[in-house]
A protein has these predicted regions:
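Aromatic/hydrophobic pocket-lining residues that form π-stacking "cages" and hydrophobic walls in ligand
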Residues: 25-28, 94
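Post-Walker A helix-loop "phosphate-sensing" segment adjacent to the P-loop in P-loop NTPases
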Residues: 29-42
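Residue-level preference for the first positions of well-ordered beta-strands
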Residues: 10-12, 72, 103
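Walker A/P-loop nucleotide-binding motif
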Residues: 8-24
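Pre-Walker A adenine-sensing motif
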Residues: 1-4
């Protein structure tokens, strides 16, 4: 069941490379769309590019609008590369805008003990 999407709960999928995190996230996004939710999946790198270029790129603005309308956003590969301060601030602002209205799935390449 996808009750958690309607309640704007978040999900962290953490583990080593090749453990199926992206597969699970994509499956949940697919099931959410089938259930009538607006859902979108994006890599962290593509999300940051979109946030940085939405004012100068028509494609980025279209993607940004789709992301902002999503009831579920899956962000893949969140720990694949180090983030700059500017990137962290953009993500913090986005997460704040989503609070209590959009569910997030984040995949991360580390174990919970790290």
């Amino acid at each position: 069941e996808l009750v958690w999407v309607g309640q704007a709960y978040n999900l962290l999928l953490a583990g080593g490379s090749g453990t199926g995190k992206t597969y699970i996230a994509a499956g949940l996004v697919h099931e959410a769309v089938k259930a009538g939710y607006r859902a979108y999946m994006v890599t962290l790198e593509d999300l940051l590019t979109c946030l940085k270029t939405r004012d100068v790129s028509r494609h980025a603005m279209k993607t940004y609008k789709r992301i902002m309308k999503a009831q579920l956003l899956a962000i893949d590969n969140a720990t694949l590369f180090p983030l700059k301060r500017e990137d962290i601030m953009l993500l913090f602002k986005l997460v704040n805008e989503f609070q209590e209205k959009t569910s997030l799935i984040v995949t991360a390449n580390y174990s919970l003990t790290e």
